[in-house]
């Protein structure tokens, strides 16, 4: 591809600084995207270092395959497949795992991918357009209840039921109007239902987010990869996760806190704190983009990066 769809990597230096602790370590970039983080990690690694990256998007794979570096390998799969893929490569432990969640700018900015409500295109929304069910296919069969639950739970949209009913009503007109298969029409349907306006936010934002998360199983895959990362990290290894909305960040925060806290024990039991198993993770804090980065890249505004280190075997 040319330069028509540019992508600015969010928290680039901060993420790589937090991630790379050993130049000769094995690292995982769970979301290659357009390779900003991966290239920066490779620049920090020594000759014995290794980076294994994952992505579902065929265009990301094309970009990754242009990297001619013996220390680098790309896997065309979800980061949820990380544990099995590393096992197959004989990798038992890694020095760091980086996850940059959500959709990338080139995906959003390309109308043909169907992620954006700002430009009309096919209603697809799959990270990998060659696998699974598209958004249009799901919308053509989902019940009002299922639509409501997805839009409410994944979009935190208070008009979820009304939007679901409007989608099903439009579907009933398919014989006359044809299928609901364009982003522009879906955005129009949502816009007619959502009467209130959030400053600076299109009324379709929450619904499109919800459908994208559902189609790509993003939150389920996130739970899987967090568990995988914990099992793969060597002592001293780092987990770095960049989230872009509250649903993702909530899952990450709860997971990290749960594995950085000592187990609760009844005070009446004769057990010393020193005898309790040590929590596997230590929290190293969170970071946000600075004002200059947000000014240069407004999509960075909602980003939050959480960092944890494996401290117990």
Swiss-Prot record:
Q: Name one Pfam family in it.
A: Methyltransf_5
**UniProt KW keywords:** Cytoplasm, Methyltransferase, rRNA processing, S-adenosyl-L-methionine, Transferase
SUPFAM superfamilies in alphabetical order:
Putative methyltransferase TM0872, insert domain (SSF81799), S-adenosyl-L-methionine-dependent methyltransferases (SSF53335)
**Single annotated GO MF:** rRNA (cytosine-N4-)-methyltransferase activity
Q: Any one cellular component term from GO for this entry?
A: cytoplasm
**Catalytic activity, per the record?**
cytidine(1402) in 16S rRNA + S-adenosyl-L-methionine = N(4)-methylcytidine(1402) in 16S rRNA + S-adenosyl-L-homocysteine + H(+)
- EC no. given is 2.1.1.199
> Which parts of the sequence bind S-adenosyl-L-methionine?
35-37, 55, 79, 100, 107
InterPro entries per record: RsmH, SAM-dep_MeTrfase_MraW_recog, SAM-dependent_MTases_sf
GO term, biological process aspect, one: rRNA base methylation
Per the record's keyword annotation, is Methyltransferase included, yes or no? yes
Which subcellular locations apply to this protein? Cytoplasm
Its biological purpose: Specifically methylates the N4 position of cytidine in position 1402 (C1402) of 16S rRNA.
What does the similarity note say? Answer: Belongs to the methyltransferase superfamily. RsmH family.
Matching NCBIfam families = 16S rRNA (cytosine(1402)-N(4))-methyltransferase RsmH
Protein name as it appears in the record: Ribosomal RNA small subunit methyltransferase H
Organism, per UniProt?
A: Burkholderia mallei (strain ATCC 23344)
What's the gene? rsmH
């Amino acid at each position: 591809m040319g330069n028509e769809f540019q992508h600015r990597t969010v928290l680039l230096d901060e993420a790589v600084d937090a991630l790379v602790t050993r130049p000769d370590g094995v690292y995982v970039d769970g979301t290659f995207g357009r390779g900003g983080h991966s290239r920066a990690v490779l620049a920090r690694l020594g000759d014995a270092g290794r980076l294994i990256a994952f992505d579902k998007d065929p265009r990301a794979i094309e970009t990754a395959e242009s990297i001619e570096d013996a220390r680098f390998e790309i896997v065309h799969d979800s980061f949820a497949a990380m544990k099995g893929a590393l096992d197959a490569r004989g990798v038992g432990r890694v020095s760091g795992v980086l996850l940059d969640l959500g959709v990338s700018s080139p995906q959003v900015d390309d109308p043909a991918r169907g992620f954006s409500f700002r430009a009309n295109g096919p209603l697809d929304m799959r990270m990998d357009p060659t696998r699974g069910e598209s958004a249009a296919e799901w919308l053509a069969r989902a019940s009002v209840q299922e639509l409501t639950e997805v839009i409410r739970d994944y979009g935190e949209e208070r008009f979820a039921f009304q939007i679901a009913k409007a989608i099903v009503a439009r579907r009933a007109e398919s014989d006359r109007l044809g299928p609901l298969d364009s982003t522009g029409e879906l955005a129009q349907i949502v816009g007619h239902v959502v009467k209130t306006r959030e400053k600076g936010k299109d009324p379709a934002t929450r619904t499109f987010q919800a459908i994208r998360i559902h189609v790509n199983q993003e939150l389920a895959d996130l739970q899987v990869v967090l568990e995988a990362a914990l099992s793969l990290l060597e002592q001293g290894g780092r987990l770095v996760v960049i989230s872009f909305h509250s649903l993702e960040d909530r899952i990450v925060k709860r997971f990290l806190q749960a594995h950085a806290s000592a187990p609760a024990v009844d005070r009446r039991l004769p057990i010393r704190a020193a005898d309790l198993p040590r929590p596997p993770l230590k929290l190293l804090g969170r970071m946000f983009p600075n004002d200059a980065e947000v000014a240069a890249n407004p999509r960075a505004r909602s980003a939050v990066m959480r960092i944890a280190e494996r401290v117990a075997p």
